[in-house]
């Protein structure tokens, strides 16, 4: 009897986690350095082909802790077109998700003063799985224990991005359809930021990201990054949902510290650690760790021209779009 009670509790808990996971999108601390995850209009802004990776580990020390690994490709094509691809593996307990997304964008020049509008589209497929095979029970012959369910979901998304050499503002719906099998809600994203050169070597870059879905609290991330030339950077990000953004002690939020440096001209590495604050404060095991790696190849799919997009000079971050210094 106790075995079935425990099994029901485990099933109920992880199914609810799976449902919550289906409702909520992935959230990376390095969103300002790699934004095609939530907006396809960000691809194709750099001259060189780039390959980047983000790995996020949460609740270290707990069995079945959330783990997300991702790889992103970004390339500029002819005629102000850009293309990108994302591969993401996400695991939590007995649930897993393998995602592939193809992003394409067209960058429209609005005037001669570097005002531009990007239009993006995303096509994606996501394989969701929930399996208790990896869990240990006394009676392994019980057919209820060997439970596995799988769904493959296709979707489409859209994005807009307005930007100059000083600021940007974007809006996107990365997954338009709302599949009922995993109770996934349509999310709306609004992001923006600006850059200001403090002197010849230092640049400050505040950013924000607002995420909203029906019948869920609004999620807000606010970050400030400080860049020293093209060599290293550090910053801080605060995120919370609902009233937690205004009153962290009321419903909890998270605080992240971000840093990174350029190892060689073509390779950048970043790291961030996130701690829960407010009612979610716990042990050090509840912290999340994230590693960011970006490799900018020497490969250019198109030749540079006077009509090309402004070249970004800080770690390949398309949000900044710094002007070249003499």
What are these regions (language model features)?
Residues 1-2, 16, 317:
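Serine/threonine-rich low-complexity intrinsically disordered regions
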Residues 1-6, 110-112:
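Positively charged n-region of N-terminal signal peptides that target proteins for export
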Residues 6-7, 266:
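Short amphipathic alpha-helical "recognition" segments used for binding
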Residues 7-8, 28:
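Short helix-onset patch at the extreme N-terminus, typifying the N->h transition
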Residues 8-16:
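Bacterial N-terminal signal peptides
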Residues 17-22:
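Sec/Tat signal peptide C-region and signal peptidase I cleavage site
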Residues 23-326:
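Subset of outer-membrane beta-barrel
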């Amino acid at each position: 009897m106790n075995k079935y009670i425990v099994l029901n509790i485990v099933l109920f808990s992880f199914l609810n986690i799976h449902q919550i996971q289906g409702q909520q999108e992935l959230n990376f601390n390095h969103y300002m350095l790699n934004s095609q995850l939530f907006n396809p209009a960000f691809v194709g802004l750099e001259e060189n082909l780039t390959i980047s990776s983000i790995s996020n580990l949460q609740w270290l020390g707990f069995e079945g802790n959330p783990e997300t690994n991702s790889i992103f490709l970004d390339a500029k094509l002819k005629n102000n077109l850009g293309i990108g691809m994302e591969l993401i593996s996400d695991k939590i307990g007995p649930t897993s998700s393998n995602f592939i997304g193809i992003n394409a964008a067209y960058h429209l020049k609005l005037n001669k003063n570097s005002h531009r509008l990007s239009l993006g589209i995303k096509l994606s497929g996501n394989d969701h799985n929930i399996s208790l095979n990896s869990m240990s029970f006394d009676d392994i012959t019980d057919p209820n224990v060997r439970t596995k369910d799988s769904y493959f979901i296709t979707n489409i998304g859209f994005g807009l991005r307005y930007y100059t050499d000083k600021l940007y503002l974007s809006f996107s719906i990365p997954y338009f359809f709302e599949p009922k099998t995993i109770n996934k809600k349509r999310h709306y994203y609004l992001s923006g930021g600006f850059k200001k050169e403090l002197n010849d070597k230092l640049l400050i870059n505040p950013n924000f990201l607002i995420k909203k879905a029906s019948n869920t609290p609004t999620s807000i991330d606010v970050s400030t990054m400080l860049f020293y030339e093209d060599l290293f950077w550090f910053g801080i990000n605060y995120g919370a949902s609902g009233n937690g953004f205004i009153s962290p002690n009321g419903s909890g939020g998270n605080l992240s510290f971000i840093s990174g440096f350029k190892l060689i001209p073509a390779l950048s590495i970043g790291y961030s650690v996130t701690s829960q604050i407010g009612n979610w404060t716990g042990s050090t095991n509840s912290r999340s760790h994230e590693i960011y790696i970006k490799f900018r190849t020497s490969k250019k799919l198109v030749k540079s021209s006077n009509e090309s997009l402004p070249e970004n000079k800080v770690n390949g971050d398309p949000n900044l779009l710094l002007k070249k210094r003499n």
